[in-house]
């Protein structure tokens, strides 16, 4: 059996698995596992409001995205035309790949959102019966996103590969692979708006709900009296399901494209389709490993949910390492040469394994810094005894400190992969890190589903036993979400470096001198970009949160009887505020990321652009890790105080709520969005590389 058949079979297997999980989740009918008619009616009402809000946002977001996709597709057609690829129009086929990537990413987001909003109420329903049943429903809901997205991504890439190579068998493979890179650009363009727009939406609602509800009115989280509570629950789906999904879809597509572009420059790989498609085989064989691992997802009534989820990550990592040994032995050529370096099949395999285990260790380190089972978060909780200021100081310190070990792990991965297999090894290491994406994304999507289930249980007043079960599920989801963010940032760093390597290969830039003014100027400018981007997204959350706070205060003042539960708040108004703010505020950060590499490359040339990419990568990775982990630390310090220390309502808890509110945009908007910044700038540079080689450096040409 050849690699093409296997890749298609595995992608179809993933899609079928997603369909099976969809049927499992939707087969549960609300109201069949206990409770009275009034409870069932409430459950369905709340679930419907969350679903409608989420889908309304997604539809409006996709309308805005479609305008950007159309603009970028036209730009690609106009600017790309490689004179070396006679008979093959680079611009048109890159644009086709670009639109395909964007479309598949949008479809994946839609499917994930649809099933998450169906799974949340069913998880709450299952929690009436048992913890084990509720866990399984939330996990199965996440699995639809995990397997569906990976299956569609791999199928999309292999179909485009077959179309391009089938239509143009005489054209050199590296030209075709460069056009295929458009697929990664499309996926990442959607991820940009999914992450930024979704992040602004979810945190505007969250901050508004917390500041007025918890701090001013002293009512608990997800209380139905809080006007922003539905918007808050909608935001969990918008940011953590659609946003995270699009982010990892982009990483998968971009790392694959980078490896294909670099690999296609080696004649031994170009001459063997099986060996050339090795990058796709890594993602493809991650699917059966993830399916086998998913059977282990079981918890008992008093079982440790967090351990059950972490076992998924560890077992899938070991399975992929074992499976890929035999895949490498069978499909990879014995040796090949790239840029004068001879690389063996085992150099490639070790690079993949190093990336794979590096991802796992980054997850372990992230857990240490963000879980309240360990010292760093408990120190933040302890610091809350002396007020919000010391809580914030300790939280910032935690974030900065937490970036040290992940960066060292990334350095070890990069150096090892580069020594063994050059730039190709770095791309393969990135693919190794995200080879378990199906199970990783399943666990990530599990988090917001169980969080929503808790919110629905609280609003529907299902009783303490049900809420205790959903709280346990949610607590585990919080820790695994932090691990997922660390994993996403690590994979973004390696993916971005792989794309940078492909860009250097593509533009024939053999060496870059740091002291060269063009390069150093680019480095400085690039290092500034993540901070500018973070400032823009932080302020956007702040502006949207101010609107939300004013609306919530207004409703408490103008609608009589909200606090007594006699009248319902106007939930829809808060949903509209979050939606409008997110769509309005995501435009400028989006333009910054998409247009910067095009303008820098055209005006200052390839060397300056290479400096910009390197600077943005180095500064962005450290900033993203510290922001995500500070936010995670503040969040779990608050939860630790609620469960183990001073308890809700204490001065210690009030200080921790302020820290948690400050941390919200850190961990759910700015931190994760930097992933997209570093990846999207790199893939944009790769796609437009030929244009920069031919037309770039306008400013220097004028002055020379």
UniProtKB/Swiss-Prot annotation:
<feature type="transmembrane region" description="Helical">
    <location>
        <begin position="64"/>
        <end position="84"/>
    </location>
</feature>
<feature type="transmembrane region" description="Helical">
    <location>
        <begin position="514"/>
        <end position="534"/>
    </location>
</feature>
<feature type="binding site">
    <location>
        <position position="667"/>
    </location>
    <ligand>
        <name>substrate</name>
    </ligand>
</feature>
<feature type="binding site">
    <location>
        <position position="664"/>
    </location>
    <ligand>
        <name>Ca(2+)</name>
    </ligand>
</feature>
<dbReference type="GO" id="GO:0006814">
    <property type="term" value="P:sodium ion transport"/>
</dbReference>
<protein>
    <recommendedName>
        <fullName>Putative K(+)-stimulated pyrophosphate-energized sodium pump</fullName>
        <ecNumber>7.2.3.1</ecNumber>
    </recommendedName>
</protein>
<dbReference type="InterPro" id="IPR004131">
    <property type="entry name" value="PPase-energised_H-pump"/>
</dbReference>
<feature type="transmembrane region" description="Helical">
    <location>
        <begin position="3"/>
        <end position="23"/>
    </location>
</feature>
<keyword id="KW-0106">Calcium</keyword>
<keyword id="KW-1003">Cell membrane</keyword>
<feature type="binding site">
    <location>
        <position position="660"/>
    </location>
    <ligand>
        <name>Ca(2+)</name>
    </ligand>
</feature>
<dbReference type="GO" id="GO:0009678">
    <property type="term" value="F:diphosphate hydrolysis-driven proton transmembrane transporter activity"/>
</dbReference>
<dbReference type="GO" id="GO:0004427">
    <property type="term" value="F:inorganic diphosphate phosphatase activity"/>
</dbReference>
<comment type="subunit">
    <text>Homodimer.</text>
</comment>
<feature type="binding site">
    <location>
        <position position="203"/>
    </location>
    <ligand>
        <name>substrate</name>
    </ligand>
</feature>
<comment type="function">
    <text>Sodium pump that utilizes the energy of pyrophosphate hydrolysis as the driving force for Na(+) movement across the membrane.</text>
</comment>
<feature type="transmembrane region" description="Helical">
    <location>
        <begin position="608"/>
        <end position="628"/>
    </location>
</feature>
<feature type="binding site">
    <location>
        <position position="635"/>
    </location>
    <ligand>
        <name>Ca(2+)</name>
    </ligand>
</feature>
<feature type="site" description="Important for potassium dependence">
    <location>
        <position position="481"/>
    </location>
</feature>
<feature type="transmembrane region" description="Helical">
    <location>
        <begin position="276"/>
        <end position="296"/>
    </location>
</feature>
<dbReference type="GO" id="GO:0000287">
    <property type="term" value="F:magnesium ion binding"/>
</dbReference>
<feature type="transmembrane region" description="Helical">
    <location>
        <begin position="429"/>
        <end position="449"/>
    </location>
</feature>
<keyword id="KW-0472">Membrane</keyword>
<keyword id="KW-0915">Sodium</keyword>
<keyword id="KW-0406">Ion transport</keyword>
<dbReference type="Pfam" id="PF03030">
    <property type="entry name" value="H_PPase"/>
</dbReference>
<dbReference type="GO" id="GO:0030955">
    <property type="term" value="F:potassium ion binding"/>
</dbReference>
<feature type="transmembrane region" description="Helical">
    <location>
        <begin position="313"/>
        <end position="333"/>
    </location>
</feature>
<feature type="binding site">
    <location>
        <position position="451"/>
    </location>
    <ligand>
        <name>Mg(2+) 2</name>
    </ligand>
</feature>
<keyword id="KW-0460">Magnesium</keyword>
<feature type="transmembrane region" description="Helical">
    <location>
        <begin position="346"/>
        <end position="366"/>
    </location>
</feature>
<keyword id="KW-0479">Metal-binding</keyword>
<keyword id="KW-0997">Cell inner membrane</keyword>
<feature type="site" description="Important for ion transport">
    <location>
        <position position="679"/>
    </location>
</feature>
<feature type="transmembrane region" description="Helical">
    <location>
        <begin position="680"/>
        <end position="700"/>
    </location>
</feature>
<feature type="transmembrane region" description="Helical">
    <location>
        <begin position="144"/>
        <end position="164"/>
    </location>
</feature>
<feature type="transmembrane region" description="Helical">
    <location>
        <begin position="387"/>
        <end position="407"/>
    </location>
</feature>
<feature type="binding site">
    <location>
        <position position="233"/>
    </location>
    <ligand>
        <name>Mg(2+) 2</name>
    </ligand>
</feature>
<feature type="site" description="Important for ion transport">
    <location>
        <position position="195"/>
    </location>
</feature>
<feature type="site" description="Important for ion transport">
    <location>
        <position position="668"/>
    </location>
</feature>
<feature type="binding site">
    <location>
        <position position="236"/>
    </location>
    <ligand>
        <name>Mg(2+) 2</name>
    </ligand>
</feature>
<keyword id="KW-0739">Sodium transport</keyword>
């Amino acid at each position: 059996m050849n690699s093409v058949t296997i890749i298609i079979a595995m992608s179809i297997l993933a899609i079928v698995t997603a369909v099976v999980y969809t049927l499992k989740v939707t087969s549960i009918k609300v109201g069949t596992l206990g409770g009275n008619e009034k409870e069932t009616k409430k459950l369905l009402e709340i679930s419907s409001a969350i679903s409608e809000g989420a889908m309304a946002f997604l539809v409006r977001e996709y309308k805005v995205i479609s305008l950007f996709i159309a603009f970028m597709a036209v730009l690609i057609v106009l600017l790309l035309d490689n004179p070396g690829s006679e008979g093959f129009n680079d611009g048109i086929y890159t644009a086709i790949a670009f639109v395909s990537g964007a479309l598949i990413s949008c479809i994946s987001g839609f499917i994930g959102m649809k099933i998450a909003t169906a799974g949340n109420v069913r998880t709450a329903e299952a929690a009436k019966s048992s913890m084990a049943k509720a866990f399984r429903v939330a996990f199965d809901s996440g699995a639809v996103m995990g397997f569906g997205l990976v299956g569609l991504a791999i199928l999309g890439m292999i179909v485009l590969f077959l179309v391009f190579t089938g239509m143009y068998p005489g054209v050199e493979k590296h030209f075709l692979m460069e056009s295929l890179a458009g697929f990664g650009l499309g996926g990442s363009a959607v991820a940009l708006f999914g992450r930024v727009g979704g992040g602004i939406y979810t945190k505007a609602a969250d901050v508004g709900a917390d500041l007025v509800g918890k701090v001013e009115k002293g009512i608990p989280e997800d209380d139905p009296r809080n006007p922003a509570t539905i918007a808050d629950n909608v935001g969990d789906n918008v940011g953590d399901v659609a946003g995270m999904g699009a982010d990892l879809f982009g990483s998968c597509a971009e790392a694959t494209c980078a490896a294909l572009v670099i690999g296609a420059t080696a004649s031994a790989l170009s001459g063997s389709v099986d060996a050339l498609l090795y990058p796709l085989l890594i993602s493809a064989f991650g699917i059966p490993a993830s399916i086998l691992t998913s059977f282990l997802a079981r918890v008992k009534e008093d079982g440790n949910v967090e351990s059950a989820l972490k076992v998924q990550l560890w077992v899938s990592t070991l399975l992929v390492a074992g499976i890929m040994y035999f895949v490498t032995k069978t499909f990879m050529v014995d040796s090949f040469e790239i840029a004068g370096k001879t690389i063996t099949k085992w150099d490639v395999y070790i690079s993949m394994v190093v990336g794979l285990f590096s991802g796992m260790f980054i997850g372990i380190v992230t857990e240490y810094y963000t879980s309240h089972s360990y010292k760093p978060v408990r120190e933040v909780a302890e610091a809350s005894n002396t007020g919000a200021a010391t809580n914030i100081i300790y939280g910032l310190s935690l974030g900065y400190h937490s970036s040290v070990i992940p960066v060292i792990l990334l350095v070890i991965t990069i150096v090892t992969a580069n020594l063994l297999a050059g730039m190709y090894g770095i791309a393969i290491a990135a693919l190794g890190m995200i080879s378990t994406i199906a199970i990783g994304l399943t666990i990530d999507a599990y988090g917001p589903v169980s969080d929503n289930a808790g919110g629905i249980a609280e609003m529907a007043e299902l009783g303490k036993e049900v809420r205790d079960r959903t709280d346990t599920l949610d607590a585990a989801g919080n820790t695994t979400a932090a691990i997922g963010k660390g994993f996403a940032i690590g994979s973004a760093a390696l993916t971005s470096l792989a794309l940078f390597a492909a860009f250097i290969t593509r533009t024939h830039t053999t060496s870059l001198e740091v002291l060269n003014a063009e390069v150093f100027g680019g480095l400085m400018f690039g290092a500034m970009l993540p901070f500018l981007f973070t400032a823009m997204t932080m302020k956007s959350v702040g502006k949207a949160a101010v609107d939300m706070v004013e609306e919530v205060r207004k409703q408490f003042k103008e609608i009589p009887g909200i606090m007594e539960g006699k009248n319902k708040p106007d939930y829809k108004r808060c949903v509209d505020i979050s939606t409008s703010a997110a769509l309005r505020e995501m435009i400028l950060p989006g333009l910054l990321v998409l247009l910067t590499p095009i303008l820098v490359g055209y005006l200052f040339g390839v060397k300056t652009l290479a400096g910009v990419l390197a600077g943005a990568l180095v500064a962005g990775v450290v900033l993203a890790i510290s922001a995500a982990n500070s936010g995670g630390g503040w969040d779990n310090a608050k939860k630790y105080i609620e469960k183990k220390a001073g308890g809700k309502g204490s001065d210690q808890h009030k200080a921790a709520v302020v820290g948690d509110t400050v941390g919200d945009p850190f961990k759910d908007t700015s931190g994760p969005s930097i992933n997209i910044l570093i990846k999207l700038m790199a893939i944009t540079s790769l796609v437009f590389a030929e244009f920069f080689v031919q037309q770039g450096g306008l400013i220097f040409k004028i002055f020379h």
